[in-house]
Amino acid sequence: MNITKLLNKVYFAPRLKEIELYTEHAGELQAGVLKRLVRMATNTEWGKKYDYASIRTYEDFKKRLPIQTYEEIKPYVARLRAGEQNLLWPSEIRWFAKSSGTTNDKSKFLPVSKESLQDTHYQGGKDAVAIYLGINPESRFFSGKGLILGGSHSPNLNSNHSLVGDLSAILIQNVHPLVNYIRVPSKEIALMSEFEPKMEAIANSTIHANVTNLSGVPSWMLVLVKHILEKTGKQSLEEVWPNLEVFFHGGVAFTPYREQYRQVIKSSKMHYVETYNASEGYFGTQNDPNDPAMLMMIDYGVFYEFIPLEDVGKENPRICCLEEVELNKNYAMVISTSAGLWRYMIGDTVKFTNNRPYKFVITGRTKHFINAFGEELIVDNAEKGLIKACAATGAQVSDYSAAPVFMDEHAKCRHQWLIEFAKMPDDLDKFAKILDDTLKEVNSDYEAKRQNDLALQPLEIIVARRNLFHDWLDSKGKLGGQHKIPRLSNTREYMEEMLKLNFKE
């Protein structure tokens, strides 16, 4: 028996029996999570403020607590970072996951507790492996090492009490020492802050390793893979790592990168598993290679609620728990966690495709959309359009961003797409038409606004120069880690910055 089969039998397979309970007992599991979270936080400052001691049911919880955004919890975070404790959660909070900012802040700093690390983030990683091994019983996953591509961390500049970093860096820093024997690169290299020297160091330290699995954000992993191929002179990654079998990816949609990965990893035996491990918690794992939807992980330290997308921003939005969601409807996710986030709206939107068990796809961000003219375009629409346009024209998209062009003396309103192609389409006009037509097919509001070109003219595509989006992130100090390109924006702020860089000599 190989080591992978032995570990699976003893350590991972038993967990699958518990995950099977998700199908029939979702409501009970989530009720148990809420009860546990409320009980643990009863004597915190937050728990006393909202009288957690008297909360008995979900309805009590729902009526008592308002929906929170980062602006509401920011004063608590500032106090935690200064060293105060027992504010939002009873255990010590010293780590803060640095996430992309709000309108008023460059970055958000989200509390990370020992419970959220162990029972949510690390449990999510273990379960992803358990699910993968359950699907692939002949795997030799543990015959080699896992390459984990993460961000960096640094001491809090304003205090000696807290440490800040990308979530991935926090996970690497705090992982059980035994895990370091089955992962590469070394912790010192993995936590380097300068992106390009880090890529070089990772390549040098892993080229001769026996890598069987990859974990990271697709965009940044692709940069590393291409660098390794260039450095070794190989045509595909399996020539460097012949035992490579799976890539656990998350952070950004995989769709724009899928074809590029096929070009650099040609093996038909390669597996791709989507995971949803955000700074706020670990929420989902793909459990069927033929279904892009992810299984919602419902027995961690996360209680879920959902706001219909059309109600986001309203004074009294409709809010439902997991058992009340409808299939194929867009919701903004609201979470309460063992890191002390309470009814916190994380900014992601999801759509459920199944409720036995609960499976979902990420459809976008509550702030990443275009609704300048009533068209309500979301990232999920954009991804579907790009898939069709690429398939019909032989194109490969590296990165993209889109924004509205408002009516002026020269032209009517339209959407402007800035696209960096890894492979140009055979016919750019055809690509644009198919993208436009597909958006009409998947979004009736967009179709209505495009009718007879009255409200919206046909979309415009501007070809981005090579490495434009990389350079834009670099200009923001956001290379590597979990930094992302804003796919859709309802204003022109990002687009104008990118266009300026695009035409810069």
Predicted regions and their residues:
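Conserved helicase ATPase motor motifs in RecA-like P-loop NTPase domains
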Residues: F96-T103
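Conserved AMP-binding loop of ANL adenylate-forming enzymes
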Residues: I131-P177
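Long, hydrophobic, well-ordered secondary-structure blocks that form the structural core
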Residues: P111, E115-H121, F248, H271
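Active-site glycine/GP-rich loop and adjacent strand/helix microenvironment
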Residues: M1-A53, F61-Q68, Y76-G83, S168-E505
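Short coil/turn connectors at secondary-structure junctions
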Residues: K106, F142-G144, N243-L244, M270
